[in-house]
Amino acid sequence: MVRLTLDLIARNSNLKPRKEETISQCLKKITHINFSDKNIDAIEDLSLCKNLSVLYLYDNCISQITNLNYATNLTHLYLQNNCISCIENLRSLKKLEKLYLGGNYIAVIEGLEGLGELRELHVENQRLPLGEKLLFDPRTLHSLAKSLCILNISNNNIDDITDLELLENLNQLIAVDNQLLHVKDLEFLLNKLMKLWKIDLNGNPVCLKPKYRDRLILVSKSLEFLDGKEIKNIERQFLMNWKASKDAKKISKKRSSKNEDASNSLISNFKTMHHIVPVYYPQVGKPKLAFFSEIQRYPVNANASPESS
């Protein structure tokens, strides 16, 4: 295995010191270091590289993030496909904008408090034990709420992403090949993420639910791409018109049901208050039987008696 040292950087960076310039002075000027796929398993003290802004260390054997406290100007850090199990020792990287940690052994997204400039976080394809899923530390989510714009959490056995509602400036979410199941949970999240214009959920069970795409388009006005497919204005307008028509029918049916209930109630009350009784009265020919309510048994004329007709 190989350790990343200043000497290794000096020997492999094609440094060309000017006259009377030392190697140390050259190292201070370095802004980019690329040691990807070099069997590196540890990072030594690189404090001389104070102007380092981009560090490529992907496809190595690094198990622990160390000795980066000096890199206060670092904006891009590539550590994907290593052996890292814990996100740590990054809080001094105040200017960090992009962090790539995919393909490691990370079980909890944590330790990112204080990284107020972090805009992209890539933690896809973690090599987790069977049955485990990637989790989010609420403290880290709160810390990234204002800054994070792009998040990749694909293939991590995740079954719930409602906690991501805190990421109010998130505009791209890639969460393919997880275990998301409920459309209602996604509707809740999209209602919160008002700036989200791209979401990819391919490979989740929820994608097979009836009206899955229609429901997500209807709930989010900002969404432009869903599962890699553009949402055209004509598609959204059609769904909005369909929903408006459906809602109008529901309201009409509800009103009709209320009117019917009121009518039935009135009839029932009338029958209860005024009992129907039979009345016999003499008539030429065969006697007839008439039915009147109690309030109809007597004529309006007070001078007439019931037997006078």
Curated annotation (Swiss-Prot):
Stated role: Regulates phosphatase activity of protein phosphatase 1 (PP1) complexes in the testis.
Keyword field: Cytoplasm, Cytoskeleton, Leucine-rich repeat, Repeat
LRR repeats: 29-50, 51-72, 73-94, 95-116, 117-138, 147-168, 169-190
Domain LRRCT: 204-242
Primary location class: cytoplasm
Signal peptide: none
Quaternary assembly: Interacts with PPP1CC isoform gamma-2; the interaction is direct. Interacts with actin, dynein, KIF5B, KIFC1 and tubulin. Associates with microtubules.
SMART domains hit by this protein: LRR_SD22
Transmembrane intervals: none
Any one GO CC term of the record: centrosome
The record's account of how the chain is modified after translation: Phosphorylated; in the testis.
Cited SUPFAM superfamilies: L domain-like (SSF52058)
Keyword Cytoplasm: yes
Annotated GO MF terms: actin binding; dynein complex binding; tubulin binding
Disulfide bonds: none
Record's protein name: Protein phosphatase 1 regulatory subunit 42
Subcellular localization: Cytoplasm, Cytoskeleton; Cytoplasm, Cytoskeleton, Microtubule organizing center, Centrosome
